[in-house]
């Protein structure tokens, strides 16, 4: 396929002014699609991609069948992308209607896919300023000249995202404070999101959901390939986009997505944070709470009727996860991100219907109980019955009342099944949030605690395939106060219903079912009859039996025929007729509830201040209510204690319903004055008697394969009997939580293996053992955590090791540590043919939380211990002067103290050599530039590295509207920028790109390599097997070696950039000749001079004195430069010195 498929102005038909000759009908047809059209896409020919591009069978079948073929930890999405044509790109290109356009007629599906690849490759392959400018201008002009450019402008962003996708292969890192506050960064790149993307090694695509259409473009382009998608809402209209994004997600089968709503109205959001419910907690909420990456509303039905609870091993810690597979139809509710993000203009105040009420009230109350997030979903249809509503209430009561260890993060994971109710399952992590004893912790990422295990009972059912299903229950014991689920820190918590009356709806409700009212009002948009029906249905709760029956789905109306009549009329006539219906039955309303419901977009809920006919038993708003007409009717609820204790030893029965417990408590209620806003303080509400509420709900089980990825349960999880299973915190294998002031608890599973190591575990020190330490190639130098930073009794300190077999000093290890099998993403894994010395003992890993900056980079932190990949900047090496006479290389090193460094062999990079197994095969299982299907002689992968680094180095100068990921290449452009601004941004980046590309192009020429190597300080790396284990970078005296061939890698760190800019005072011609250098070696270092034919005794001395330090550096271990390993400190078998290998694994085995 020729290269002229790319945008070529010469091929544009002159008689068409839209560049690609897009038919107007296509644009109008597509962009006029509304929610109904997308929602009914299976019936709508305009957007029926499901018919045109059917989903592969792998997504329609049981994903468990593919867990060995496409394991999650092996990036099965990437493997599928490499091996199959991506249907999402077809959808993306379908907008251009390639088959019918004169621009590129006759495209088949593969050619459409290659089209996008070529865009990225061509842009990355441009070698100079003019080429990039011209290409960019042509590309932009082609787009802006299309009809309906205002609709198609997102394509510009997607092209940039595509470029970033292909050229940026490094995982994201946690932003620094500098990056965090940089214009364009806007805190939307929060650490939680970054951590999650590192978890899955995701393709990083950032887009903006301004309107309804952009999400469709995004999903059409990305399709099933995207592993982690972030959609950033930049303005209030995004609520509509959000609704449709998730409808689209069902159609387009995105595997995982994240919703991050963050309009950029910083002042109004700051005012909201200050003036509403948080007050003096604003600073903690804004800066100390971990920003959440989080989701659309989890379906309450899925949360509770199909709830799955597992222990997920993420980032070196266990997290209790509730998995709910929700069906998102409507407004997005990111409770964590909205409440904590200073750029967000209030919690959902711009979103339709009463999610604002949920946030303003529920989360405020929940904050008092250390609740930081709630996710509730609205139903897509009108089929929700009282059982489902009860489940929603139980879940809400559960997180607001029962837990001191509450929701802090939202995880997205799980396989998707296109035929499932929704293909975007969610997981909600249960952990702790801000607490008094952690106020001084400035860590951006807060580590969660366990939910108190005494509240959990797990059950196990063995499966034929060896997997296990778990069921979680809450224990409610009537007489055991200490073990009662109501107990939080051994203190009773009062469920203050008056808070909801006064806080949530500006005037209260007619009864204690106000919470039901909140839930139903969220459904009023699509289900007005359900709203009105239950609005009145809740009025019938007057007795103990009513409360029980309501939550058992058996509410009786107690001879109140008006309730049934009114409810029936509302059901028949809808909410629009509420005013007339209420007037007919003498029901007074506040502010004409029907009119207010229809007219005020921010307050589309009905406030019933008083029922003239009937009772107003517990309304909290306005003046104090008159006494109820019949006080005896309410006495039993105040006098009785209702406790329903399910028998946890009984097998779970399908559709079994738990009950709600109402307790009259003597504990003083939470002062209402602390909970209401300044506006509502004028009302001076009168709270009703506090009621304590406890709920329990049966939860289905989840199928877990320890150490493997999570798979959904195929059949009904309710069918199997429950068997007691010990869990962390209970007798048996127990987690141990240790407080670390800089990063949260570190948990160790003592006996049982970790479950679901999705997040690649990170290197962590272990006590000195003969076993091989974890292999991490890159480490910050002398990263030592002082004992004062670790809050453990008498933390052990590792002495400086004397031998290579001892674990080098790195971090003071806390005694309990997380044990996790390594993941191919971050930790190099050995092939089966070369097992580690102790294969049964996997490496120990930990998350470093506060680390010194990387040398030569400046203020950028080094948050993760990442393996060096060909596009990861290496630590600044010592200066070298390299002379190449004939085939020999002489390496000269300065006398000053050198810093650790790593050299990467390109053979090892490509996974082509047998030796060097200490290095990972970085991209064997994920997308790289080399995996692109088309060959282009102009495109070179090293140019991509230069562009990536150059873009990153220029981000701070690019100005408003541009952001990056801090690691190069994640090029985020504000879509509102005009094309000329983008071109200017490109121009600002050209200088560095041009310099780097030109430099490397010159260096790559063999005839110029000798003269250019000294100027650019090019590393020369030889194949290890060619010179018996000695590297050119071996520390110590200069060594004469004769490599078979050389590999050149240019170190692209900022320090190296500075070196490139320094004037070169010494040319190659000025250097001493080879003979002179050799003579100098012999005269200055006669005792140390060694060559490749040295005796075994000399080899022993060399190996102990120099091979060990470089071996440690290649492992990423920080050596104490002031205490070098002394020769002879460890006996080494040198019976066959000629077979010594630099490979760390082989050498360790020989020793």
Curated annotation (Swiss-Prot):
Q: Where is the sequence biased in composition, kind Acidic residues? A: 1082-1091
Compositionally biased residues, Low complexity = 867-878
Q: Which organism is it from?
A: Ostreid herpesvirus 1 (isolate France) (OsHV-1)
Chain spans, region Disordered = 611-633, 709-740, 753-778, 795-880, 1060-1151
Q: Where is the composition biased (Polar residues)?
A: 1131-1142
Composition-biased stretches (Pro residues): 754-773, 811-842
Any idea what this protein is called? Answer: Uncharacterized protein ORF78
Show the disulfide pairing.
Answer: none
């Amino acid at each position: 396929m020729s290269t002229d498929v790319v945008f070529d102005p010469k091929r544009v038909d002159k008689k068409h002014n839209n560049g690609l000759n897009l038919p107007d009908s296509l644009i109008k047809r597509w962009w006029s699609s509304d929610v109904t059209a997308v929602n009914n896409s299976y019936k709508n020919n305009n957007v029926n991609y499901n018919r045109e591009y059917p989903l592969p069978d792998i997504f329609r079948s049981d994903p468990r069948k593919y867990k060995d073929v496409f394991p999650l930890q092996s990036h099965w999405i990437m493997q599928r992308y490499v091996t199959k044509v991506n249907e999402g790109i077809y959808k993306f290109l379908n907008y251009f209607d390639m088959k019918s356009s004169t621009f590129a007629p006759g495209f088949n599906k593969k050619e459409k896919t290659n089209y996008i690849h070529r865009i990225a490759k061509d842009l990355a392959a441009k070698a100079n300023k003019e080429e990039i400018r011209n290409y960019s201008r042509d590309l932009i002009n082609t787009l802006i000249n299309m009809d309906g450019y205002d609709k198609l402008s997102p394509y510009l962003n997607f092209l940039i995202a595509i470029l970033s996708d292909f050229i940026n292969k490094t995982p994201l890192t946690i932003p620094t404070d500098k990056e965090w506050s940089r214009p364009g960064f806007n805190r939307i790149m929060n650490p939680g999101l970054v951590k999650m993307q590192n978890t899955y090694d995701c393709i990083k695509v950032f887009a903006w959901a301004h309107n309804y259409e952009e999400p469709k473009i995004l999903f059409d382009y990305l399709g099933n390939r995207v592993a982690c998608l972030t959609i950033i809402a930049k303005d209030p209209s995004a609520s509509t986009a959000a609704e449709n994004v998730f409808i689209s997600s069902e159609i387009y089968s995105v595997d995982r997505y994240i919703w991050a709503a963050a309009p950029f109205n910083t002042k109004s959001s700051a005012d909201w944070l200050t003036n509403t419910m948080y007050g003096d907690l604003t600073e903690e909420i804004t800066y100390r709470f971990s920003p959440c990456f989080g989701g659309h509303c989890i379906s309450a039905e899925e949360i509770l009727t199909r709830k799955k609870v597992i222990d997920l091993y993420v980032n070196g810690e266990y997290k209790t996860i509730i998995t709910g597979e929700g069906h998102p139809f409507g407004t997005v509710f990111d409770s964590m991100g909205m409440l904590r993000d200073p750029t967000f203009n209030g919690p959902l105040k711009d979103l339709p219907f009463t999610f604002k009420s949920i946030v303003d009230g529920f989360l405020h109350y929940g904050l008092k109980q250390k609740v930081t997030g709630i996710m509730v979903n609205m139903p897509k249809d009108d089929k929700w019955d009282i059982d489902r509503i009860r489940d929603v209430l139980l879940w809400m009561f559960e997180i607001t009342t029962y837990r001191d260890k509450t929701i802090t993060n939202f995880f997205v994971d799980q396989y998707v099944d296109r035929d499932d109710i929704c293909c975007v399952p969610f997981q909600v992590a249960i952990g702790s949030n801000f607490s008094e004893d952690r106020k001084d912790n400035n860590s951006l990422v807060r580590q969660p605690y366990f939910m108190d295990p005494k509240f959990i009972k797990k059950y196990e059912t063995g499966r034929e395939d060896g997997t296990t299903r778990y069921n979680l229950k809450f224990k409610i014991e009537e007489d055991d106060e200490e073990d009662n689920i109501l107990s939080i820190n051994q203190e009773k918590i009062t469920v203050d219903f008056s808070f909801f009356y006064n806080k949530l709806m500006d005037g209260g409700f007619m009864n204690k079912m106000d919470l039901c009212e909140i839930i139903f009002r969220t459904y009023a948009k699509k289900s007005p009859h359900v709203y009105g029906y239950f609005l009145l249905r809740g009025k019938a709760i007057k007795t103990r039996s009513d409360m029980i029956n309501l939550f058992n789905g058996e509410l009786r109306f107690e001879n109140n025929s008006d309730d049934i009549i009114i409810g029936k009329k509302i059901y028949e006539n809808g909410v629009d007729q509420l005013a007339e219906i209420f007037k007919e039955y003498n029901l007074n309303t506040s502010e004409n509830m029907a009119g207010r419901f229809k007219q005020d977009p921010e307050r589309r809920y009905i406030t019933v201040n008083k029922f003239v006919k009937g009772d107003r038993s517990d309304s909290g708003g306005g003046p104090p209510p008159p006494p109820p007409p019949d006080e005896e009717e309410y006495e039993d609820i105040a006098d009785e204690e209702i406790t329903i204790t399910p028998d946890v030893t009984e097998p779970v029965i399908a559709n079994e319903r738990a009950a709600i417990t109402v307790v009259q408590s003597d504990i003083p209620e939470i002062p209402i004055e602390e909970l209401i806003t300044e506006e509502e303080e004028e009302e001076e509400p009168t709270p009703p008697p506090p009621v304590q509420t406890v709920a329990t709900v049966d939860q289905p089980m989840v199928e877990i394969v320890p150490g493997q990825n999570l798979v959904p349960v195929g059949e009904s999880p309710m069918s199997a009997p429950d068997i007691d299973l010990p869990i962390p915190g209970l007798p048996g294998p127990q987690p141990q939580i240790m407080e670390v002031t800089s990063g949260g608890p570190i948990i160790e599973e003592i006996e049982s293996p970790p479950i679901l190591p999705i997040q690649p575990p990170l290197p962590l020190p272990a006590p000195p053992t003969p076993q091989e330490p974890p292999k991490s190639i890159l480490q910050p130098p002398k990263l030592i955590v002082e004992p004062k930073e670790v809050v453990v009794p008498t933390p052990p300190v590792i002495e400086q090791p004397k031998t290579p077999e001892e674990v080098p000093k790195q971090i003071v290890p806390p005694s309990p540590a997380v044990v996790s099998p390594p993941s191919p993403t971050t930790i190099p894994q050995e092939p089966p043919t070369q097992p580690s010395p102790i294969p049964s003992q996997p490496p120990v890993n930990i998350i470093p939380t506060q680390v010194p900056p990387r040398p030569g980079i400046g203020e950028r932190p080094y948050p993760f211990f990442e393996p060096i990949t060909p596009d990861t900047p290496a630590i600044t090496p010592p200066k070298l002067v390299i002379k190449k006479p004939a085939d020999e290389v002489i390496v000269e090193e300065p006398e000053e103290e050198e810093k650790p460094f790593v050299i990467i062999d390109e053979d090892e990079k490509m996974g082509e050599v047998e030796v060097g197994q200490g290095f990972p095969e970085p991209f064997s299982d994920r997308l790289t530039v080399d995996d692109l299907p088309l060959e282009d002689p102009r495109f070179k992968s090293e140019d991509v590295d230069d562009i990536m680094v150059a873009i990153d180095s220029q981000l701070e100068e690019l100005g408003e509207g541009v952001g990056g990921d801090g690691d190069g290449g994640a090029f985020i452009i504000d879509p509102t920028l005009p094309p000329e601004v983008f071109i200017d941004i490109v121009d600002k980046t050209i200088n560095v790109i041009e310099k780097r590309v030109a430099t490397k192009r010159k260096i790559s020429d063999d005839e110029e390599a000798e003269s250019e190597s000294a100027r650019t300080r090019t590393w020369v790396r030889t194949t290890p097997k060619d010179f018996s284990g000695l590297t050119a970078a071996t520390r110590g005296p200069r060594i004469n070696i004769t490599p078979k061939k050389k590999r050149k890698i240019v170190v692209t760190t900022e320090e190296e950039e500075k070196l490139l800019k320094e004037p070169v005072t010494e040319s190659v011609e000025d250097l001493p000749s080879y003979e002179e250098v050799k003579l100098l070696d012999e005269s200055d270092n006669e005792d140390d001079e060694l060559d490749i034919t040295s005796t075994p005794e000399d080899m022993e001395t060399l190996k102990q004195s120099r091979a060990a330090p470089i071996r440690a550096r290649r492992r990423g271990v920080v050596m104490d430069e002031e205490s070098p390993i002394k020769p002879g400190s460890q006996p080494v078998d040198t019976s066959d010195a000629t077979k010594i290998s630099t490979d760390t694994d082989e050498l360790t085995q020989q020793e």
